[in-house]
Amino acid sequence: MNLFQAIILGIIQGLTEFLPISSSAHLRIVPALMGWGDPGAAFTAIIQIGTLAAVLIYFAKDIVSISGAVISGLVKGKPLGTDEARTGWMIAVGTIPIVVFGLTFKHEIETVLRSLYIVSASMIGLALVLVVAEKHTANRARDGRRGKSINELSWTDAIIIGLAQAMALIPGSSRSGVTITGGLFRNLDRETAARFSFLLSLPSVFAAGMLELYQTRQEIMSSTHNMLNLAVATIAAFIFGYLSIAFLLNYLKRHTTGIFIAYRLILGIGLIVMIGTGHLLP
C-alpha cells in the first residue's frame, strides 16, 4: 500500500463509518475495483481509531457527562441514580454482544466473511430490513406516538440494539446501519437512534482498534512506511468522520434513511453483476 492509497482508504473510512452504508464494505470494494488488494481486517480496525476520535470530540460534552455520572453513581452507591448514569450502563450492556461474537468468530470475520459475495448479500439484506424499520417508524408517527429519547431507553432496548450491533461484524452490514435499524424497531426517532448508535460504538471500536494495534505491533514497527500509511489514513478517517457525523445527525432531523436504502440496493446488486460477469473477483 502506498501513501495515496492510504489517504483514499482513510477518507472512505471516515465518510462511510457513520453513514448506514458500511465502511468495511467500501474498504473491501474500492481496493478490489482499483486492483489494490484487500487492505485486511487489521488495517480497517486500526484506522477506526480515527473515527473513534471523531465521536469522542463531537460528543465530548455527552461523554464527560455520562462518564462523570457513572463514576459519581458508583461512589455514592447509586449506580443508576441519574439518567446519564443509566445511559452509561446501557452502553456497557449493549456492548457485550459484539465483544462476545467478535472474540468467538474473529477468524471467520477476518477471512471467509470478507468475501464480496457476503458483502453484497449484507448490503442488500440490511437495505430490505431498513425498509421495514422505516415502515414501522412511519406507522408510529401516523398513530401520533413520538419516538423515545435516549433517557427513555429500556434495558431490553439496549440489549436488542447491542445484538444488532454484533451483526456489524459481517462486512457489508454497517455498524450504524444495524444499530439505527434496531433503534427504529425499538421506537427511537431517527436522530436519537443515530446518536445512541455513535455512543454505543465507542467501547467496541476502541477495544477492536487497540487489540489489532497490539497484535500487529511488530509488523507496524518494522517499517516507517507502514507507520506513516496507518497514521495518515487514521488522520483522514478522523477529519472526514467528524464531518460525516455532523451531516448524518442534521440530515436525519428532516429525512428518512431512504437515500441510503437505495444506495445499498444499487451497490449490492451492482456487485453481484460485476462478480457474475467476471469484472470483479469475489
Curated annotation (Swiss-Prot):
One of its GO terms (cellular component) is plasma membrane. The chain crosses the membrane at residues 1-21, 40-60, 89-109, 112-132, 153-173, 196-216, 228-248, 258-278. InterPro entries: UppP. It is a multi-pass membrane protein. It catalyses: di-trans,octa-cis-undecaprenyl diphosphate + H2O = di-trans,octa-cis-undecaprenyl phosphate + phosphate + H(+). Bacitracin is thought to be involved in the inhibition of peptidoglycan synthesis by sequestering undecaprenyl diphosphate, thereby reducing the pool of lipid carrier available. This is Undecaprenyl-diphosphatase. It comes from Chlorobaculum tepidum (strain ATCC 49652 / DSM 12025 / NBRC 103806 / TLS) (Chlorobium tepidum). The gene is uppP.
